[in-house]
Amino acid sequence: MATTRGGSGPDPGSRGLLLLSFSVVLAGLCGGNSVERKIYIPLNKTAPCVRLLNATHQIGCQSSISGDTGVIHVVEKEEDLKWVLTDGPNPPYMVLLEGKLFTRDVMEKLKGTTSRIAGLAVTLAKPNSTSSFSPSVQCPNDGFGIYSNSYGPEFAHCKKTLWNELGNGLAYEDFSFPIFLLEDENETKVIKQCYQDHNLGQNGSAPSFPLCAMQLFSHMHAVISTATCMRRSFIQSTFSINPEIVCDPLSDYNVWSMLKPINTSVGLEPDVRVVVAATRLDSRSFFWNVAPGAESAVASFVTQLAAAEALHKAPDVTTLSRNVMFVFFQGETFDYIGSSRMVYDMENGKFPVRLENIDSFVELGQVALRTSLDLWMHTDPMSQKNESVKNQVEDLLATLEKSGAGVPEVVLRRLAQSQALPPSSLQRFLRARNISGVVLADHSGSFHNRYYQSIYDTAENINVTYPEWQSPEEDLNFVTDTAKALANVATVLARALYELAGGTNFSSSIQADPQTVTRLLYGFLVRANNSWFQSILKHDLRSYLDDRPLQHYIAVSSPTNTTYVVQYALANLTGKATNLTREQCQDPSKVPNESKDLYEYSWVQGPWNSNRTERLPQCVRSTVRLARALSPAFELSQWSSTEYSTWAESRWKDIQARIFLIASKELEFITLIVGFSTLVFSLIVTYCINAKADVLFVAPREPGAVSY
């Protein structure tokens, strides 16, 4: 009788099937990305419209959680909308909208037919001398300044002056579909070519499949209001091990410095008088983090930086009877975040300067678009009902006029009629205390800025242009006409601050440097990654500089690039290079006559050596510091506050845009049925093979002992 020895290992048929399945999965994992690249064309240079929230409502845009997809239709004139809104047979549509048609009228039509609209991709227009576009409201920061129904009701809600007369309010609307900005012309051309190749029918007939489609991802986690999203985030962070925060308050840092150093650990005595020079750092537009802000912010803070440099060069600044504080507020676009926080800190003893220390307040508004030599002085009519304040304001205006008399290119003008202050940080200080203050601006009534808080408030809007044949380094040092004009305004401001601080001997010698102004304008509006900005920053901040303009949206991750660059620019322009080593610069407490309470110390990259082979780092000592610009509403957990700004930004998981070819619904259905049938057939075959494995897969005999 013959006997054989067999094993008890896995069935050979099953082992083969497992190996085959593993190979298929591995191939799918390895080849998935390459297949996706063949199907989709990603759009890498886009900017989304995101959701923002305040105490009462939400604004902005979002997609569905899985993204929104639609057939692309190019709208180059308003008549093209008919296909999208009524005639097109393949809704929903993804509208590729020419920038010039991005108006309130068109958006209202699209908003009213959301069942046929999947989303919107907006191209950049080329503004001309007669065009205008401001997605902001006509009365910016309404309700958070000094005027209300109970105080100055005749000035409340911009009753006498619509400051932003051209504002269409689009940036403060809520859209249920995604809206993206296409920033790259080449990507726009690719989309239009895809549209022309696949989506244009012959002789007015409907196009045949496959069609060119676009998919936009911008799902927002927060809904309804700041109170709702903050409450949800609070509950998550309290009770969840892995909390999912759905929104964050808009926040950053204010930049401030003193003409004469003060001990920040103890603050000022009540009898010490301080002159405040203020301006704003931030701007915004309809699209996230696209905020060039040339006229609405950059020209003003560049002018103040140049004025600070000029004033610090005066020989007798250390003997002036009053100190000067330069402040650059963040978040003013969103209901005065920075200034309201500083006032709050001053009132509660959390800032070294108190409200009672403020002698006078000079603020720079929009100053780059003077239509003549005039620079207008705006004051508050309500606080001047107090005779003492009225006299102080009169002295302030007289000092400004005297300072301007020595600069023939600038003529200081008073308003002929009683008028409210334009949107300004001064309003938040006046809410807390009657002080003498003035806002300097290039407009007497409505803004001259036709692109207020829009994507087109760029260098070209304030006439900052360069000869085409110059290199970037030559552009950096090329003094433009705008730089000269702003330098003149900076000179007037510096001389006025000098006299307000008690100076008398050197006013006429104070002169702002046009070279400084032109470098700052170039860095903030044209190319941040330049040799001068590199020299004034710390080594680990180099990545903040890009070959593009800086954007001035406050955001939620702080400090932002703008804040850092302004901080170090101000330190470079007003501070002093010391002989401290890197270790001493990082810890100056061990060095005699150096104090962290009086100064800030920064180890910066420094200029190139003579051979331009390496930089010469140095330690800069200055009085420049940062102060938190987070609305007091979030400090106090008053998320429904009407006293303080409550703006928050929704979080999101993915921001993405891509195009691809889409098949007809019929073909998709057939593909699904065939795929499902193939799956069922495969399962049946697999089952049958597995059931008959002992017959189909016979194991070979193993050699063994044979007995007879």
From Swiss-Prot:
<dbReference type="GO" id="GO:0000139">
    <property type="term" value="C:Golgi membrane"/>
</dbReference>
<keyword id="KW-0325">Glycoprotein</keyword>
<keyword id="KW-0812">Transmembrane</keyword>
<feature type="disulfide bond">
    <location>
        <begin position="194"/>
        <end position="212"/>
    </location>
</feature>
<dbReference type="GO" id="GO:0051402">
    <property type="term" value="P:neuron apoptotic process"/>
</dbReference>
<feature type="disulfide bond">
    <location>
        <begin position="49"/>
        <end position="61"/>
    </location>
</feature>
<keyword id="KW-1133">Transmembrane helix</keyword>
<feature type="topological domain" description="Lumenal">
    <location>
        <begin position="28"/>
        <end position="668"/>
    </location>
</feature>
<feature type="signal peptide">
    <location>
        <begin position="1"/>
        <end position="27"/>
    </location>
</feature>
<dbReference type="GO" id="GO:0050435">
    <property type="term" value="P:amyloid-beta metabolic process"/>
</dbReference>
<dbReference type="GO" id="GO:0007220">
    <property type="term" value="P:Notch receptor processing"/>
</dbReference>
<dbReference type="GO" id="GO:0007215">
    <property type="term" value="P:glutamate receptor signaling pathway"/>
</dbReference>
<comment type="similarity">
    <text>Belongs to the nicastrin family.</text>
</comment>
<feature type="glycosylation site" description="N-linked (GlcNAc...) asparagine">
    <location>
        <position position="386"/>
    </location>
</feature>
<comment type="function">
    <text>Essential subunit of the gamma-secretase complex, an endoprotease complex that catalyzes the intramembrane cleavage of integral membrane proteins such as Notch receptors and APP (amyloid-beta precursor protein). The gamma-secretase complex plays a role in Notch and Wnt signaling cascades and regulation of downstream processes via its role in processing key regulatory proteins, and by regulating cytosolic CTNNB1 levels.</text>
</comment>
<dbReference type="GO" id="GO:0016020">
    <property type="term" value="C:membrane"/>
</dbReference>
<feature type="glycosylation site" description="N-linked (GlcNAc...) asparagine">
    <location>
        <position position="593"/>
    </location>
</feature>
<dbReference type="GO" id="GO:0008233">
    <property type="term" value="F:peptidase activity"/>
</dbReference>
<dbReference type="GO" id="GO:0005794">
    <property type="term" value="C:Golgi apparatus"/>
</dbReference>
<dbReference type="GO" id="GO:0034205">
    <property type="term" value="P:amyloid-beta formation"/>
</dbReference>
<dbReference type="GO" id="GO:0042734">
    <property type="term" value="C:presynaptic membrane"/>
</dbReference>
<dbReference type="GO" id="GO:0005783">
    <property type="term" value="C:endoplasmic reticulum"/>
</dbReference>
<feature type="glycosylation site" description="N-linked (GlcNAc...) asparagine">
    <location>
        <position position="44"/>
    </location>
</feature>
<dbReference type="GO" id="GO:0021549">
    <property type="term" value="P:cerebellum development"/>
</dbReference>
<feature type="disulfide bond">
    <location>
        <begin position="139"/>
        <end position="158"/>
    </location>
</feature>
<dbReference type="GO" id="GO:0042987">
    <property type="term" value="P:amyloid precursor protein catabolic process"/>
</dbReference>
<feature type="glycosylation site" description="N-linked (GlcNAc...) asparagine">
    <location>
        <position position="611"/>
    </location>
</feature>
<keyword id="KW-1015">Disulfide bond</keyword>
<feature type="glycosylation site" description="N-linked (GlcNAc...) asparagine">
    <location>
        <position position="505"/>
    </location>
</feature>
<dbReference type="GO" id="GO:0070765">
    <property type="term" value="C:gamma-secretase complex"/>
</dbReference>
<dbReference type="InterPro" id="IPR008710">
    <property type="entry name" value="Nicastrin"/>
</dbReference>
<keyword id="KW-0732">Signal</keyword>
<feature type="glycosylation site" description="N-linked (GlcNAc...) asparagine">
    <location>
        <position position="128"/>
    </location>
</feature>
<protein>
    <recommendedName>
        <fullName>Nicastrin</fullName>
    </recommendedName>
</protein>
<feature type="glycosylation site" description="N-linked (GlcNAc...) asparagine">
    <location>
        <position position="463"/>
    </location>
</feature>
<feature type="glycosylation site" description="N-linked (GlcNAc...) asparagine">
    <location>
        <position position="434"/>
    </location>
</feature>
<dbReference type="InterPro" id="IPR041084">
    <property type="entry name" value="Ncstrn_small"/>
</dbReference>
<dbReference type="GO" id="GO:0050673">
    <property type="term" value="P:epithelial cell proliferation"/>
</dbReference>
<dbReference type="GO" id="GO:0005789">
    <property type="term" value="C:endoplasmic reticulum membrane"/>
</dbReference>
<dbReference type="GO" id="GO:0042098">
    <property type="term" value="P:T cell proliferation"/>
</dbReference>
<dbReference type="Pfam" id="PF18266">
    <property type="entry name" value="Ncstrn_small"/>
</dbReference>
<dbReference type="GO" id="GO:1900271">
    <property type="term" value="P:regulation of long-term synaptic potentiation"/>
</dbReference>
